[in-house]
């Protein structure tokens, strides 16, 4: 997506938490190319530590991780009063409703290139993605 469509927020800090280091590096490279400052954590514990000690504007969180899942990490962040919007990454599997109540947006990993920047921009400006309307 060209920068003119989704302008970067040069002061925004994005925390990416994923146990897959290759995914983290892709996220870092992609987001830094658009002017974001990126913090990465390859474990839930490190992610929670960074979220509690650094000023973070948006969190990108993988759902499936070995020691804690995305729901547990999001719950802990909310318990710690972490106010940064949370974007949950999934591989398309069903995500339990309680998890959806803890996060601000969800993006499928196979759609990162097209959906991640607009989602970050919206959350950074507005704080939460509006719920989908199923009315015809």
Region annotations inferred by a language model:
Residues 40-49, 70:
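Helix N-cap/capping motif at the beta->alpha junctions
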